[in-house]
Curated annotation (Swiss-Prot):
PANTHER family (alphabetical): VENTRICULAR ZONE-EXPRESSED PH DOMAIN-CONTAINING PROTEIN HOMOLOG 1, VEPH-A/MELTED
Protein name, entry field: Ventricular zone-expressed PH domain-containing protein homolog 1
Domain of life: Eukaryota
Biased composition (Basic and acidic residues): 492-502
Gene Ontology, cellular component aspect: plasma membrane
Location of the region described as Interaction with TGFBR1 in the Swiss-Prot/TrEMBL record: 201-319, 663-833
Record bears the keyword Cell membrane: yes
Residues annotated as domain PH: 716-819
Gene: VEPH1
Lineage: Eukaryota, Metazoa, Chordata, Craniata, Vertebrata
Length: 833
């Protein structure tokens, strides 16, 4: 042991203790273990708790030792001696004397804990420390327990198996009020499920007492437990989960757990279907998840299949959500399993209808017919299914109030020669019998029918026609064949391509801001946009319509304005209004118009929550009018829908929709500035940009195809360089670390430096990133002018770039990579479905 250590510790000389800091770290590094053993002897003496001199000497020496260990990176060499001193503290009183007054041994334990457990990423050190660490959880010192819980949570992230043997102790600590340790349980459950299962009922009872993050970790635990497929756990979980579905904070996570259970134990959810239906009606954005649960239960037997189909079909006709493709897949899966429900014509139902509403009506009628035992296959007086394969054609008849869709069955089997009996040949022959105009506007393919209806009602069109002659249903209703903006690769959003003969490309495409009942809207698409006015045919009533007259007078200005503003502010594909405690908010969905090979938003959407819905509604109204050559009237279905949205947001005494649109046709500049500022704050422009060439808003990858091919090569980094990192969740870690980061693939990785403190491998998984934001201006000071944050489900990171420009580059690249990772997940889900 170094001479000065021997003097200070041997004689307990407080006057010389400060001189230890004048020594170089390397000079005393070999003496640290021996010094720790000497401190253990001093602190274990009977009079230590009352001897202030000894306490001061020990505190100074421990501070010097832990500093030297950190600077010389020799924690593994001295870990055994540190843990030995730490363990000796358990033999003494650790409860505080009074408020904020720790005992002498609690101070030692706290200092050593910080030194040891900051090395949570070093398994050899943790193997020695964790058995001792968990003992401190029950020693009555709340501050020590809280800090210990933080460190154990860190250890669980990197080395959960070391904590698994202590699961029982951890669970008991949680039940005694140390709920911070809930974040550890999902990590240790895989190794030690039984101790958690034994106390699961007690853990669930804590839910109402927990903070939101802790509730989330408890639900994560249930999700992990559900995957283990243990019946006892399922029986405890389901009533608890159903009971908390009304909480909008977590109902999305809860439904994911129920979906997991439904895969292997659907019968357990059968009795809860009425309650799930009620929740689905209350929260329409959960419809997609509800559909998967109903779909799973519907596979149990035919009786349950019929019951579940009734709900699924009713939701298929509902235009207040955007999950129709999932509903169709679940309906198709059930009817394929129990083919007797719809009979041999089930395939025709999915292929012959041009709208979700029409399909729903056909299915409803057929379900009623089969339930009543009717053997006839007549669906309605207007739509009838033949015994043999037949084709349809659309005949549009005009009414003075609206245009109505009729489907006429055209039998032609006897016209087919013996050499053309395949379904593909029959379709080609049928198309050859209709006029040139009909041939351009009609395709008897399921995906084209879906795209056709949705383009008029929700802005969804066909992407291509490569599977036009396929007969299998799953391929023809695949999401990959639907273009949410109804555009081909070279279409302009504000124009009609009159040269295209494809159904999805010959129509005017516009975003999904309007839900229109297909029965009240013509589905014939003319070749020329000047003829395409299904909503704007003038009637005598319209000439008394003030909104119609106002728009007629200002039509050219409205179109010019919409064209110009469309380059600065994107128009959402879908808009819903949701009530909050204080007011209404608009939930806006944006997708890419091109949907190229590496598109970031072909299957997913960028979702924006706006506290100011009315400017968005006004922007959508102007854009809607720009799509038609004639003025819209107040009776137009699109206007009716927008008016309904407006009324939901309308304050008492405020202007009605038509009055507001007439008095202030164009949004005020301050409102537009606020909209743009909000888009910037949520980093919208990192992942979207207006393409002058295409005349449409496209994602980063579609706007930069030359970068997309490079970025998507395996291992090719999107950006790399040095950043300073700080983990802010644990306030006691205050150091910034400069590391070399690489953003590539689905991860943000950093290069392990010379410091042994750096973990070997702890990348940030981009698919788990919830948001990426610049540090809010109100939080910025001179030390954080270029900082940004990354939020995951269980951690927050803060980074500093070399300057603000570099920070912006990192922000954009990370946002692009996160969108790419989530899009990849969406594609995998779609493929699975």
């Amino acid at each position: 042991m170094h001479q000065l250590f021997r003097l200070v510790l041997g004689q307990k000389d407080l006057s010389r203790a400060g001189d230890l800091f004048s020594l170089d770290d390397s000079e005393i590094e070999d003496s640290l273990t021996e010094a720790l053993e000497q401190i253990k002897i001093i602190s274990s003496s009977s009079d230590y708790q009352t001897n202030n001199n000894d306490q001061a000497v020990v505190e100074i020496c421990i501070t010097r030792i832990t500093t030297a260990i950190r600077e010389t990176e020799s924690i593994e060499k001295h870990a055994k001696a540190l843990v030995g001193l730490w363990d000796s503290c358990l033999e003494h009183n650790l409860r505080p004397f009074g408020k904020d007054e720790d005992t002498p041994h609690a101070k030692i334990a706290s200092d050593i804990m910080s030194c040891i457990l900051q090395n949570y990423n070093r398994p050899p050190v943790m193997a020695l420390a964790i058995p001792i660490a968990v003992k401190f959880l029950h020693r009555g010192n709340k501050e020590l327990c809280r800090n210990m819980s933080n460190y154990l949570s860190l250890a669980a992230i990197t080395k959960a198996d070391l904590l698994a043997d202590h699961t029982e102790v951890i669970v008991k600590s949680i039940l005694q009020g140390n709920t911070m340790l809930l974040r550890v349980l999902p990590a240790v459950y895989e190794k030690q499920p039984q101790p958690i299962n034994r106390h699961l009922t007690e853990l669930l009872a804590l839910m109402s007492q927990l903070e939101q993050p802790e509730q989330y970790h408890l639900l994560r635990l249930l999700h992990v437990a559900a995957k283990k497929k243990q019946l006892e756990v399922v029986q405890k979980c389901i009533p608890f989960l159903i009971g908390h579905l009304k909480d909008s904070t977590h109902n999305d996570i809860i439904l994911n757990i129920l979906i997991e259970i439904a895969v292997y134990e659907p019968v357990a959810l059968n009795s809860f279907l009425p309650m799930l239906k009620e929740i689905g009606e209350r929260f329409p954005y959960l419809t997609g998840q509800m559909a998967r649960i109903y779909g799973a239960v519907g596979h149990v037997d035919e009786e349950r299949a019929r019951s579940c189909l009734t709900y699924l079909v009713s939701q298929l006709a509902n235009m207040e959500h955007s999950f129709h493709h999932i509903l169709l897949l679940e309906i198709k899966s059930i009817t394929d399993t129990f083919s007797s429900i719809l009979g041999p014509q089930s395939r025709d139902i999915f292929r012959m209808s041009n709208s979700f509403t029409a399909i729903a009506k056909l299915l409803t009628r057929q379900l009623e017919n089969t339930k009543a035992g009717s053997g006839r296959r007549k669906i309605s007086t207007e739509i009838e299914f033949p015994e043999k394969l037949e084709e349809t054609k659309l005949i549009v008849t005009e009414n003075e109030d609206h245009e109505k869709l009729q489907v006429k069955i055209q039998a032609f089997e006897d016209k087919i020669n013996a050499g053309s009996n395949t379904p593909g040949s029959i379709r080609r022959y049928s198309l050859g019998q209709v006029s040139k105009e009909e041939r351009k506007n009609i395709r008897f393919n399921r995906s084209k029918s879906l795209a056709f209806h949705t383009m008029l009602t929700k802005g969804v069109g066909s992407d291509d026609g490569e599977d036009e002659n396929r007969g299998d249903i799953p391929a023809s209703i695949s999401l990959s064949e639907i273009d949410p903006l109804g555009q081909g690769n070279d279409k302009l959003p504000f124009k009609t391509d009159t040269e295209r003969s494809q159904l999805g490309e010959s129509s005017v495409s516009y975003p999904n801001i309007i839900h229109i009942d297909s029965e009240n809207l013509s589905e014939t698409v003319k070749e020329n946009s000047q003829e395409e006015t299904p909503e704007t045919t003038a009637s005598p009533i319209e000439y008394q319509d003030k909104l119609y007259l106002h728009l007629k007078k200002n039509l050219s200005k409205v179109k010019a304005y919409a064209m110009e503003i469309g380059k600065k502010i994107p128009v959402p594909d879908q808009c819903t209004i949701e009530d909050t405690v204080r007011s209404c908010v608009a939930k806006l969905f944006f997708t890419c118009s091109l949907k190229g090979h590496y598109c970031l938003y072909s299957k997913s959407s960028f979702i924006l929550i706006s506290q100011e819905p009315q400017p968005w509604i006004q922007i959508m109204f102007l854009f809607q009018q720009s799509l038609f050559p004639e003025p819209l009237s107040i009776q137009s279905h699109s206007v009716q829908f927008l008016r309904a949205l407006w009324e939901k947001t309308q304050a008492g005494g405020a202007h009605s929709f038509e009055t507001a649109m007439m008095e202030s046709t164009f949004p005020q500049q301050k409102d537009l500035d606020q909209v743009q500022l909000h888009l910037e704050e949520v980093r919208f422009f990192d992942v979207f940009g207006f393409s002058e060439t295409a005349g449409a808003w496209q994602c980063f990858m579609c706007n930069n195809p030359e970068k997309a091919t490079v970025v998507n090569q395996d291992g090719q980094p999107l950006i790399e360089g040095k950043l300073k990192e700080k983990q802010v969740r644990w306030k006691f870690i205050k150091r910034w670390k400069t590391r070399y980061f690489t953003l590539a693939g689905n991860q943000l990785l950093f290069q392990k430096g010379k410091s042994k403190d750096d973990p070997d491998d702890c990348p940030i998984e981009l698919s788990k990133v919830q948001s990426v934001k610049a540090v809010a201006k109100k939080r910025r000071d001179r030390s954080l002018p270029r900082a940004f944050e990354i939020f995951t489900d269980n951690k927050t990171y803060v980074f500093k770039a070399k300057d603000e420009k570099n920070a912006e580059e990192w922000l954009q690249c990370i946002n692009v990579a996160v969108a790419q990772a989530k899009e990849r997940e969406s594609r995998e889900v779609t493929t699975y479905l």
